[in-house]
């Protein structure tokens, strides 16, 4: 079930505060965050985020095509090792 349109997208308050401060100062340093649930908004375009995947921080550069998705979608938490190949 998707989020109600009247509520709008969820973005962590501390994260949006950091993005707005960076926009005012016109700085583009990476923003470290644990908020994988935050939705990417148009004002985040061009910023670099370091999103935590449970073990380490993965670098995510936000582009126009990412708007509307969540930050966690771009930092996978599981590593798939291929199935073993049977010899014989």
Curated annotation (Swiss-Prot):
InterPro entries per record: Ribosomal_uS19, Ribosomal_uS19_bac-type, Ribosomal_uS19_CS, Ribosomal_uS19_SF
GO CC annotation terms, alphabetical: cytoplasm; small ribosomal subunit
Pfam families in the record: Ribosomal_S19
UniProt KW Acetylation keyword: no
Any one GO BP annotation for this protein: ribosomal small subunit assembly
GO molecular function, one term: rRNA binding
Entry-linked Gene3D superfamilies: 30s Ribosomal Protein S19, Chain A
Alphabetical keyword list: Ribonucleoprotein, Ribosomal protein, RNA-binding, rRNA-binding
Protein family per UniProt: Belongs to the universal ribosomal protein uS19 family.
PANTHER family reported in the protein's UniProt record: RIBOSOMAL PROTEIN S19P FAMILY MEMBER, SMALL RIBOSOMAL SUBUNIT PROTEIN US19M
NCBIfam families: rpsS_bact
Role summary: Protein S19 forms a complex with S13 that binds strongly to the 16S ribosomal RNA.
Protein name: Small ribosomal subunit protein uS19
Gene: rpsS
